[in-house]
Design a protein with these regions (language model features):
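Alpha-helical "lid/cap" subdomains adjacent to substrate-binding clefts that gate access
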Residues: 15, 37-45, 88, 115-116, ...
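Active-site glycine-centered loops adjacent to acidic/histidine catalytic or metal-binding residues
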Residues: 62, 87, 150
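Active-site glycine/GP-rich loop and adjacent strand/helix microenvironment
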Residues: 72-75, 86-88, 104-109, 128-130
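Short Gly/Pro-enriched turn/cap motifs at secondary-structure boundaries
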Residues: 83-89, 140-144
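Residues embedded in well-ordered beta-strands
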Residues: 94-96, 112
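Residue-level recognition of short loop/turn positions
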Residues: 99-102, 110, 156-157
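Conserved ATP-binding/catalytic segment of the ANL
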Residues: 106, 114-166
Length: 166
């Protein structure tokens, strides 16, 4: 990273833990990185990583099926570092959180994340279908909502927190 002059990087959740296991070095902050973008950093490593390496890890939620149309990112303060927060909705994305029976959960309760584009075309920016698998497509897109299988809760300020996979 230092040699490339990169100013942004993409990370997977395990990478901060791996880098934190490397012995500290006086050059840990000697780079041009302004931020990292990814998902799944262990809450106990998030603040430690940012302090040691000197740049924020911007947590986000997306999946292949959501494409760019459903990406949600913690790109605005407060980011709620260290508790699996992946940001707030934008005006381009709508969500619902449902229980195992398909009913919306009460405020603050965890539920499966359903997501779609806001506006006339709920699939705008999302995947169109699974290749040669109409049944799987129908199972994933129900009633114009993408069923993600991710369990999420929404905080009082609208921030979204990853809880688990269904």
């Amino acid at each position: 990273v230092r040699e490339s002059g990169a100013t942004a990087l993409h990370y997977l959740g395990v990478l901060p833990a791996i880098l934190l296991n490397i012995p500290e070095n006086k050059n840990d902050k000697n780079h041009s990185v302004k931020f990292g973008f990814g998902a799944g950093v262990n809450p106990k490593h998030h603040a430690l990583f940012e302090k040691r390496f000197g740049f924020p890890l911007i947590e986000a939620w997306a999946m292949t099926e959501s494409g760019a149309g459903g990406c949600i990112a913690a790109s605005h303060e407060p980011r709620h570092v260290g508790n699996c927060c992946f940001g707030k909705l934008t005006d381009k994305v709508s969500i619902k959180l449902i229980d195992e029976n398909g009913h919306e959960v009460s405020e603050g309760a965890p539920g499966e994340l359903l997501v779609r584009a806001t506006g006339d075309n709920p699939k705008y920016g999302f995947f169109s279908h699974y290749f040669k698998n109409e049944a799987a497509t129908a199972e994933t897109w129900k009633d114009n909502w993408l069923h993600t299988g991710d369990v999420v809760r929404q905080g009082e300020d609208g921030s979204l927190y990853f809880v688990d996979r269904r």
